[in-house]
């Protein structure tokens, strides 16, 4: 996002409701530098700050994508599960949109083994191998495959921990953020008025409850990622 486009983007952000925060009493004082003052009932995000920080995050994402870095998008709330999956697939990112299993990053060796099992079971199913096994054994294998699909469908092609992780809800995915911090994985995250902007490397002050707001922010980030990958392919 270039500075000359900020005015247009500010209008779009207003229309998307990016600036609406939580009730005044429900806030995190650490987010204060990014808010408008003298708001009584609802905290209002200063979208000029949002535009600037989003521009920084987009530049970072473009450069990282150009270098071949791998991204993961995390958003495990039921209301945004579909949006997360659709957005991640368009940008060819890994994603987690159901439940974050503890150790997905910090215990990668175990997760890698489970992904290999996932790949093996899917290959057997596609090849029709289940048709030649005892019913009880097939039932067990199908249950395993169902569970693996539920939790790992968005990372089934992931061969290593991601280089960058994007979060859309800090409170919902706090455990995942802590794993990134522990491993030193750079993070980009939407931070609403009840969030701590210091928990992610690149905070983007924005309404994280409204699907329109989330979709707008993610569209900017994924466009930046695709631009970086496109540039890399041309070189």
Curated annotation (Swiss-Prot):
PANTHER family: 30S RIBOSOMAL PROTEIN S2 PROKARYOTIC AND ORGANELLAR, SMALL RIBOSOMAL SUBUNIT PROTEIN US2M. The keyword Plastid applies. The gene is rps2. This is Small ribosomal subunit protein uS2c. It is found in: Plastid, Chloroplast. NCBIfam families: rpsB_bact. Keywords: Chloroplast, Plastid, Ribonucleoprotein, Ribosomal protein. PROSITE patterns: RIBOSOMAL_S2_1. It comes from the Eukaryota. Belongs to the universal ribosomal protein uS2 family. It comes from Zygnema circumcarinatum. GO terms for biological process: translation. SUPFAM superfamilies: Ribosomal protein S2. Gene3D superfamilies: Glucose-6-phosphate isomerase like protein, domain 1 (3.40.50.10490), Helix hairpin bin (1.10.287.610). GO terms for cellular component: chloroplast; mitochondrial small ribosomal subunit. CDD domains: RPS2. InterPro entries: Ribosomal_uS2, Ribosomal_uS2_bac/mit/plastid, Ribosomal_uS2_CS, Ribosomal_uS2_flav_dom_sf.
């Amino acid at each position: 996002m270039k500075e000359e486009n900020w005015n247009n983007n500010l209008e779009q952000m207003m229309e998307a409701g990016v600036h609406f925060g939580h009730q005044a009493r429900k806030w995190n004082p650490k987010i204060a530098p990014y808010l408008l003052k003298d708001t009584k009932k609802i905290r209002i995000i200063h979208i000029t700050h949002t535009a600037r920080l989003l521009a920084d995050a987009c530049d970072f994402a473009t450069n990282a994508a150009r270098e071949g870095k791998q991204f993961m998008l995390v958003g495990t709330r039921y209301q945004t599960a579909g949006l997360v999956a659709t957005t991640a697939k368009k940008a060819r990112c890994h994603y987690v949109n159901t439940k974050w299993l503890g150790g997905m990053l910090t215990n990668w060796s175990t997760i890698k083994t489970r992904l290999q099992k996932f790949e093996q079971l899917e290959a057997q199913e596609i090849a029709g191998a289940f048709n030649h096994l005892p019913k009880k054994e097939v039932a067990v294998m199908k249950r395993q495959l169902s569970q693996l699909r539920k939790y790992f469908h968005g990372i089934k092609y992931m061969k290593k921990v991601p280089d960058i992780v994007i979060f859309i809800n800090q409170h919902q995915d706090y455990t995942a953020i802590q794993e990134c911090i522990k491993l030193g994985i750079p993070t980009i995250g939407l931070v609403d008025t009840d969030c701590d902007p210091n928990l992610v490397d690149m905070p983007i002050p924005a309404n994280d409850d409204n699907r329109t707001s989330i979709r707008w922010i993610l569209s900017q980030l994924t466009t930046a990622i695709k631009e970086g990958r496109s540039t890399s392919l041309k070189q």
